[in-house]
């Protein structure tokens, strides 16, 4: 079911682009990037774990109280975030943004409550994730119909269209919350009325469960902040310094930091799925203090670097055809974002390993240093890119990459000190990976002289994508035959 939902979400994003191509959806980009920051605040799974613990102990009354207090906390916090959203909208001074942002915070509240109720139902062994799956599927399907009607049939103000896009999952969520309460939660309440003898401070327990996971929460907030900061800075520089029109700035930022970033993030998730098992094995090895964890660290790091670098190179070559295939757009806004895949993948891996073996304070400090680095260099790099004749977002991406590099360097230093690993032991292997990928890059670049990548129609773009992926596969098959496995 999860795969079906992911595929439908991807289809929805592509349809959204094509149906709104001639409209201004900048308010959706702005509000959704803020939504990602807010959602990160609630990214801890500790409350669900707390509910499970009480259920295992047969503390059903306490579990029920924690569940209700958690819902109340979500409502209070999202109301507070709604106020913050209003203040942000006033400061940014974009017309009707405050209405969109407030609607977005209501959507956030409903989504979080649905997720919590879903986890609550899972504890009582109802069909796993049934509520969440119904909510996601219905929201996607109804919104596909909704955006078609909004942008092709009923013509209205741009901000109203964005509000209605958020209202669809809000209304569906409210209906599902009411139904789940009537059919399930209310029924379970009769089993949870008997108070346990042990008195528990529910609010403190919930607070503790959130604080225990603060490193991951801060990590997620900082990741989302990279995008939001880029959007705000680009908006002000292009509009005020370089005198772009509002519509041009809106389309420019939406293409880059909404559709482009979504595609890059999907690719990152695919790469992460390739090496996720390896990272988990490494984490287990470090926690158990196995003798071979140093060799395992080098091996897994090599795999991550090799996989991410190869995919980055191939995507740099075929980003144009991918852009034509998905968006049928002559302006290739994916190309400049591709380097993020390599740096973000390594950054994500290094941070995740640090989380299990280093002090929380140290991790938070180096994450903040990377974000501050991005903020400091954002404006100078955007201006430099513009003056050199490149698109302005190249400078914005460069500042993000610089921040990620700082994080990677500090993170590796912390790991080498904590785990007593000498990176020089692995230096030759990393050099070999770089050489192999340089050769791949040269081969693919030479092929571009024969098979052009600047195609203008979808069918030829798909054929070009298949061809270059095939060449990459052939390259690695030949490499495996020529180079013995133990020397790779």
Where are these regions (language model features)?
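Transmembrane helical elements of multi-pass membrane transporters/channels
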Residues: 1-17, 21, 172, 184, ...
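Specific pore-lining/lateral-gate transmembrane helices of multi-pass inner-membrane transport
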Residues: 53-70, 256-342, 346, 357
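Short membrane-interface helical motifs at transmembrane helix boundaries
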Residues: 79-98, 312-329, 380-386, 450
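Alpha-helical transmembrane segments of multi-pass membrane proteins
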Residues: 94-118, 257, 329-350
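Membrane-interface junctions at transmembrane-helix termini in multi-pass inner-membrane proteins
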Residues: 110-135, 339-367, 390
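Membrane-interface helix-loop junctions in multi-pass transport and translocation proteins
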Residues: 130, 140-179, 183, 361, ...
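Interhelical loop/hinge segments that connect adjacent transmembrane helices in multipass membrane
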Residues: 159, 181-223, 417-434
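Transmembrane alpha-helical segments of multi-pass transport proteins
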Residues: 221-225, 232, 428-485
């Amino acid at each position: 079911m999860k795969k079906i939902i992911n595929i439908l979400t991807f289809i929805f994003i592509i349809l959204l682009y094509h149906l709104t191509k001639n409209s201004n959806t900048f308010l959706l980009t702005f509000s959704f990037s803020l939504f990602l920051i807010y959602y990160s605040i609630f990214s801890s799974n500790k409350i669900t774990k707390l509910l499970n613990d009480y259920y295992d102990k047969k503390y059903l009354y306490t579990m029920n109280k924690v569940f209700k207090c958690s819902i109340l906390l979500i409502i209070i916090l999202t109301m507070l975030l709604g106020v913050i959203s209003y203040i942000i909208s006033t400061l940014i001074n974009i017309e009707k943004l405050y209405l969109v942002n407030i609607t977005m915070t209501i959507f956030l509240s409903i989504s979080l409550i649905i997720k919590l109720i879903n986890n609550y139902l899972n504890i009582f062994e109802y069909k796993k994730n049934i509520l969440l799956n119904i909510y996601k599927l219905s929201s996607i399907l109804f919104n596909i119909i909704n955006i078609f009607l909004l942008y092709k049939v009923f013509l209205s103000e741009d901000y109203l269209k964005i509000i209605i896009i958020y209202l669809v999952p809000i209304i569906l969520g409210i209906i599902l919350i009411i139904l789940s309460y009537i059919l399930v939660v209310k029924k379970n309440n009769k089993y949870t009325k008997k108070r346990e003898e042990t008195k528990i401070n529910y609010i403190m327990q919930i607070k503790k469960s959130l604080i225990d996971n603060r490193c991951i929460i801060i990590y997620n907030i900082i990741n989302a902040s990279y995008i939001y900061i880029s959007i705000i800075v680009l908006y002000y520089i292009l509009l005020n310094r370089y005198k772009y029109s509002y519509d041009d700035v809106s389309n420019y930022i939406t293409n880059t930091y909404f559709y482009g970033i979504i595609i890059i993030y999907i690719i990152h998730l695919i790469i992460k799925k390739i090496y996720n098992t390896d990272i988990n094995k490494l984490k287990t090895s470090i926690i158990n203090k196995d003798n071979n964890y140093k060799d395992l660290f080098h091996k897994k790091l090599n795999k991550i670097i090799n996989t991410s670098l190869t995919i980055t190179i191939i995507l740099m070559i075929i980003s144009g055809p991918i852009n034509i295939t998905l968006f049928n757009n002559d302006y290739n806004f994916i190309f400049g974002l591709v380097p993020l895949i390599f740096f973000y993948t390594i950054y994500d891996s290094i941070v995740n390993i640090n989380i299990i073996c280093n002090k929380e304070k140290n991790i938070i400090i180096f994450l903040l240093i990377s974000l501050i680095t991005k903020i400091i260099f954002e404006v100078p790099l955007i201006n430099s890119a513009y003056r050199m004749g490149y698109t302005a977002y190249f400078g914005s991406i460069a500042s993000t990459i610089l921040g990620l590099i700082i994080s990677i360097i500090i993170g590796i230093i912390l790991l080498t000190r904590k785990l007593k690993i000498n990176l020089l032991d692995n230096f030759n292997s990393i050099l070999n990976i770089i050489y192999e990928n340089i050769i791949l890059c040269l081969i693919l670049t030479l092929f571009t002289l024969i098979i052009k990548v600047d195609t203008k129609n979808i069918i030829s773009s798909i054929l070009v994508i298949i061809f270059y992926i095939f060449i990459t596969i052939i390259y690695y098959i030949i490499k495996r035959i020529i180079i013995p496995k133990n020397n790779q």
